[in-house]
C-alpha cells in the first residue's frame, strides 16, 4: 500500500537554526532525531525568498516565472496544476492544515463559472488542497480594516476556549501584559521578551499539532498527503511562557555582516538595507531581544514535533508515513545589515529539508547529510513519483529526490539552482526608480559561486562560496571575475529558454506524432497522385459525384 506523506512546512525557519545544522546554542532534539532517521539536505534553495511566491512554486512544482504568482497576494492563475491535482489523479488525497498564502484568481474563477463553495472551486481557491483547516496566521487590523478579511479558525478556537474580544489573536496570542496590566503587542519588537498572554497549549503551534493528530487518527480509508503548514516562527516575534525565557542575549550567535558591505553597495542591496526593517535589525539591541524570542518559537516548534512523532509511533503510523520537514524561506535577523527575507543570501534563500522514508529502500541513507543542489520544487516531483511512479516532466520542473534518499545516487542531474524575486510592489522599487516590469532579481548558484542579476540596468552581484562562504565580499563589479559572470549569464539564458509553458502535451506524445503512420487524408507537398500509395490517394480519385460548377 502507498505510504502516506506528512509534509511539514514551517514559516521563516532558517536553515541554520537547528542543532543538527550546527547552531551553537539552540536545541532541537526532536527535529534532530528525524534527521538521524532520514536524510538532511544542506543545500536546499527555495524558488523565491518570500512566502507567497515560494509556496506557489512548491505547490505547483514550477518556477515563479512559470506559474506567475510572483509575490504575496498575487493570485495563482486558474488552470495551473498543483500538487493536489497530480496526487488525486494517482489516487492519493491532498489535505491542508494551516497556512498556504494562496491568493484566489477571482477573475479566472468568474470567467469559468467556478463557485468558491463547489468542490472544484474550493480546491482551485486553495492551491489544490482539500481543506481540513486553513489559517494564514496574521489577523492584524488597523485604521483601514483587517489585513486578512477571511474568518479566522484560530480566533474561533480561542473564543471557544474563553478568550474574549472580536480578535483574541491580536489581544492575547500576539500580545503580552505588563505589571500595570497594559498590553504589550508583539508588533513592537521591544516586547519580544515578554510572554504572550495565552496558555501555551492554546497558542498557534500546539493548536495546529492537535489538528494534525486529529486528522491522522480519522483519515484511514485511502492514502493521503497532509500538508501541515505551521505559522511560526514567522513574526510577530512573541512566544508564550516558558519559551520566552528559554534563551537570552548570551545565546545569540555572532552577527554575519561586515563594514565592507556598506561600501560601493549594489543599489538594490542598499535599498533593502536602508528600509525600516533593515535599519531596525542592524541595531544590536534589537537582535538581543528579538532573536531569543525567535529561538523560543523554534524550540516550541521542536517540542511539538516531539509530541507529533510520539503520536505517530504509538499509533503505529510512523512505519506507514513519509515525513518531510522544511520551510518556505529564512530570516536575515540582522545578518548582512538586513531583516526579514527577500534577497539571496543563504540566511534568506536556503531552507532546512529533512526527508524520512520508513521503507527498507531508505535504510542505507539513514542519518546521511546530502550536499546535493536541491530546489523546493523537487518536493512536488518526489511526492508525485511516490504516488504514481512517474513524474510529468512537461509540467513539473523539479527532480525526484528518491534516488538520493534511497542511496542510488549522490547528486541530481543539475548544474545550478535558481531563485527569483519580484520586488515591484515594494517601496524599494519606487526609491530606485525601477518600473514594475524591471523590479525583478534572479539568482543562479552552484557549490562554488552565487550570482545575482537585477533587471533595470544594474550590475550583477557575485560571491565566491568557497573562499567567502558568508557572502560578505561582492565580486560583481570586479573585472577579474568577468569570465565567471559570463558563465552565469549563459546559465541564466539557458534556463530562461526552458520549455515551461507547453504543459498540455508531453514529449512522448510529440514523438509519437513525429513517427505516426496515421493517414487521415491530409496530403502536403505532393504534385502527382502517383507519388503516393493508392491507399492514400484513392479517396481523391475516380468518377466525380456530379457536376455543379458552371465553369467546368
Predicted feature residues:
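Formylglycine-dependent sulfatase
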Residues: 1-452, 460, 469-490, 522-552
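Short, acidic/hydrophobic/Gly-rich beta-strand patch recurrent on exposed beta strands
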Residues: 464
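A contiguous, mid-protein "functional segment" used to position or interact
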Residues: 479-522
Amino acid at each position: 500500500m502507498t505510504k502516506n506523506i506528512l509534509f511539514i512546512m514551517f514559516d521563516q525557519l532558517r536553515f541554520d537554526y537547528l542543532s543538527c545544522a550546527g547552531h551553537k546554542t539552540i536545541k532541537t532534539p526532536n527535529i534532530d532525531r528525524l534527521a538521524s532517521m532520514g536524510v538532511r539536505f544542506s543545500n536546499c534553495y527555495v524558488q523565491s525568498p518570500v512566502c507567497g511566491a515560494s509556496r506557489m512554486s512548491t505547490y505547483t512544482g514550477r518556477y515563479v516565472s512559470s506559474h506567475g504568482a510572483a509575490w504575496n497576494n498575487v493570485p495563482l492563475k486558474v488552470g495551473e496544476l498543483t500538487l493536489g491535482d497530480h496526487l488525486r489523479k494517482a489516487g492519493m488525497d491532498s489535505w491542508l492544515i494551516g497556512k498556504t498564502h494562496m491568493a484566489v484568481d477571482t477573475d479566472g474563477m468568474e470567467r469559468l463559472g467556478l463557485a468558491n463553495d463547489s468542490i472544484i472551486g474550493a480546491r482551485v481557491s486553495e492551491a489544490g488542497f482539500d481543506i481540513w483547516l486553513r489559517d494564514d496566521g496574521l489577523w492584524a487590523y488597523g485604521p483601514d480594516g483587517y489585513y486578512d478579511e477571511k474568518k479566522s479558525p484560530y480566533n474561533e478556537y480561542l473564543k471557544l476556549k474563553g478568550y474574549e474580544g472580536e480578535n483574541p489573536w491580536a489581544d492575547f496570542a500576539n500580545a503580552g501584559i505588563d505589571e500595570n496590566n497594559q498590553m504589550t503587542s508583539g508588533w513592537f519588537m521591544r516586547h519580544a521578551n515578554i510572554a504572550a498572554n495565552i496558555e501555551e497549549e492554546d497558542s498557534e503551534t500546539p493548536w495546529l499539532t492537535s489538528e494534525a493528530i486529529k486528522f491522522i487518527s480519522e483519515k484511514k480509508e485511502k492514502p493521503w498527503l497532509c500538508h501541515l503548514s505551521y505559522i511560526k516562527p514567522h513574526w510577530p516575534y512573541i512566544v508564550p511562557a516558558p519559551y520566552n525565557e528559554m534563551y537570552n542575549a548570551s545565546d545569540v550567535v555572532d552577527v554575519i555582516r561586515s563594514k565592507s558591505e556598506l561600501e560601493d553597495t549594489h543599489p538594490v542591496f542598499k535599498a533593502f538595507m536602508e528600509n525600516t526593517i533593515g535599519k531596525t535589525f542592524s541595531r544590536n539591541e534589537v537582535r538581543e531581544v528579538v532573536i531569543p524570542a525567535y529561538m523560543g518559537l523554534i524550540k516550541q516548534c521542536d517540542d511539538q514535533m516531539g509530541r507529533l512523532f510520539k503520536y505517530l509511533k504509538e499509533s503505529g503510523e510512523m512505519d506507514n508515513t513519509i515525513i518531510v520537514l522544511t520551510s518556505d524561506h529564512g530570516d536575515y535577523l540582522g545578518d548582512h545589515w538586513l531583516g526579514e527575507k527577500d534577497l539571496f543570501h543563504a540566511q534568506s534563500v536556503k531552507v532546512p529539508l529533512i526527508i524520512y522514508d520508513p521503507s527498507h529502500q531508505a535504510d542505507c541513507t539513514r542519518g546521511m547529510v546530502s550536499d546535493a543542489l536541491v530546489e523546493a520544487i523537487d518536493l512536488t516531483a518526489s511526492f508525485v513519483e511516490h504516488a504514481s511512479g512517474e513524474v510529468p516532466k512537461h509540467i513539473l520542473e523539479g527532480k525526484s529526490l528518491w534516488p538520493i534518499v534511497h542511496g542510488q545516487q549522490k547528486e541530481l542531474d543539475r548544474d545550478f539552482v535558481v531563485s527569483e524575486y519580484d520586488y515591484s510592489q515594494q517601496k524599494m522599487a519606487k526609491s530606485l526608480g525601477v518600473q514594475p516590469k524591471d523590479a525583478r532579481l534572479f539568482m543562479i548558484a552552484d557549490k562554488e559561486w552565487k550570482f545575482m542579476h537585477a533587471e533595470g540596468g544594474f550590475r550583477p552581484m557575485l560571491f565566491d562560496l568557497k573562499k567567502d562562504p558568508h557572502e560578505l565580499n561582492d565580486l560583481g563589479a570586479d573585472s577579474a571575475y568577468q569570465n565567471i559572470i559570463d558563465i552565469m549569464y549563459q546559465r541564466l539564458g539557458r534556463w530562461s529558454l526552458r520549455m515551461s509553458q507547453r504543459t498540455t502535451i508531453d514529449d512522448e506524445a510529440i514523438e509519437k506524432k513525429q513517427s505516426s503512420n496515421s493517414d487521415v487524408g491530409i496530403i502536403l507537398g505532393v504534385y502527382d497522385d502517383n507519388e503516393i500509395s493508392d491507399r492514400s490517394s484513392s479517396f481523391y480519385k475516380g468518377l466525380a459525384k456530379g457536376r455543379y460548377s458552371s465553369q467546368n
